[in-house]
């Protein structure tokens, strides 16, 4: 999978200092699962996912992406690959790799197609092993001004005239985490 999706750059965070973060990143890069971890995050971002869930069963690790509020299952990994991927992700977030039962929270960064993302990772022991939830959020909003939306001039003028009205009600909607 990691050869079929655009590459990501994983950035270690969560340690007390940059030197320890760099040490954690170097240690994680030694694992063959480092490319798998990057690949699953890249796959999620390619599908426009904002969250990624990795869930252990006895024989495999299930993978789901949250795309616009809908969970989408993708091909699972075998348990050995999934466990190694968990270790990589925990290492770059400065969490205890050996602790598979307690709830742990950490953070790491990702660069994908030139865009930087902040990621939070939560791991929790479950009956069949461990569940990892990763939330992926862009460092800065994709749209800062109405012009950034790509709205045609005529539509923008109509929208502005509605906003300028003295009475009325306008409902805005956005994907979670986007305003």
Regions of interest found by a model, annotated:
Residues 179:
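Conserved glycine(s) of the Walker
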């Amino acid at each position: 999978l990691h050869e079929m999706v655009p590459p990501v750059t994983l950035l270690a965070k969560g340690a007390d200092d940059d030197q320890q973060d760099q040490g954690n990143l170097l240690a994680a890069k030694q694992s063959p699962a480092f490319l798998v971890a990057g690949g699953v995050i890249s796959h999620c971002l390619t599908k426009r996912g904002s969250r990624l869930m990795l869930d252990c069963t006895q024989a495999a690790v299930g993978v789901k992406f949250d795309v616009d509020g809908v969970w989408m299952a993708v091909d699972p990994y075998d348990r050995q690959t999934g466990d190694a991927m968990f270790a990589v992700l925990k290492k770059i977030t400065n969490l205890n790799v050996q602790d598979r039962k307690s709830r742990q929270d950490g953070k790491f960064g990702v660069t994908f197609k030139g865009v930087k993302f902040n990621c939070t990772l939560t791991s929790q022991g479950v009956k069949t092993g461990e569940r990892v939830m990763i939330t992926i959020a862009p460092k800065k909003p994709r749209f800062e001004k109405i012009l950034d939306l790509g709205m045609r001039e005529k539509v923008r003028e109509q929208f502005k005239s509605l906003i300028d009205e003295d009475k009325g009600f306008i409902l805005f909607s956005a994907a979670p985490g986007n305003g």
